[in-house]
Design a protein with these regions (language model features):
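GST-like fold's C-terminal all-alpha helical module
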Residues: 98-195
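Terminal-tail/helix-coil boundary detector
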Residues: 199, 203-215
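Short beta-strand(s) of the beta-wing in winged-helix/HTH DNA-binding folds
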Residues: 54-57, 154, 200
Length: 215
């Protein structure tokens, strides 16, 4: 049994939960962080001195933190080809795109765009203020668009760990009140992800409670 600490509205928790769901693993999740608190509790800091989520513990093993490290742990322990091959060359190809997604998509969307919109009252939102950040993100989404023109998934013909790392933010990207240039390949890719039960369960989570002024 895998124990997960973290609220379901955290994108970093969602990416881990989606991976757990795709791998069909038994789990138990405890809400903490944001309105649930608990991150400064001594027992939590003993597991993760950073006071951040997610944290997991697999059985009686050592607590693990940092979502990308958790994903690699889950893939290495429970994943099979083509999701996470044993052979180094295809596995490295997948890992390359997973790391690219973490650095270039997550960091350029979550804080400069998602949180800017969520934490600004609707009546005061300014699309022009987001244009620089949208431009940066757009350059990387254009790379993804070209990649997805070659194959149905980010690293090739099969769904892999790279899609977990890349695709978990697309629900927010496609549902946030922002202007989005049409990218046909990216939209079709997102629709393929939406067809996956684990994506719908763990990623397509409403985020209204994160908005400024939410109860």
């Amino acid at each position: 049994m895998i124990k997960v600490w973290g609220r379901k509205t955290s994108s970093n928790v969602q990416v881990v939960m989606w991976c757990i769901g795709e791998l069909g693993l038994a789990y138990e999740r405890a809400d903490c962080g944001h309105r649930y608190g608990g991150l400064d509790a001594p027992e939590f800091l003993a597991m993760n001195p950073n006071g951040t989520i997610p944290v997991i513990r697999d059985g009686e093993g050592e607590p693990l933190w940092e979502s990308a490290a958790i994903l690699r742990y889950l893939a290495n322990r429970y994943g099979r080809a083509p999701f996470w091959p044993d052979d180094l060359a295809p596995r490295t190809h997948i890992d390359k795109w997973a790391e690219w997604s973490k650095i270039n998509i997550a960091l350029n969307f979550s804080f400069p765009i998602f949180w800017q919109v969520i934490r600004t009252p609707r009546g005061r939102q300014d699309a022009d203020a987001l244009k620089p950040a949208m431009g940066v993100l757009g350059r990387y989404l254009d790379i993804a668009e070209k990649q997805l023109a070659k194959a149905p998934y980010l690293s090739g013909d099969d769904f892999t760990l790279a899609d977990i790392q890349f695709g978990h933010l697309l629900y927010r990207y496609f549902t946030l009140e922002i202007e989005r240039p049409e990218r046909v390949g990216l939209r079709a890719y997102y629709e393929r992800l939406v067809a996956r039960p684990a994506y719908r369960e763990h990623v397509m989570v409403p985020y209204d409670e994160l908005r400024i002024g939410a109860a």
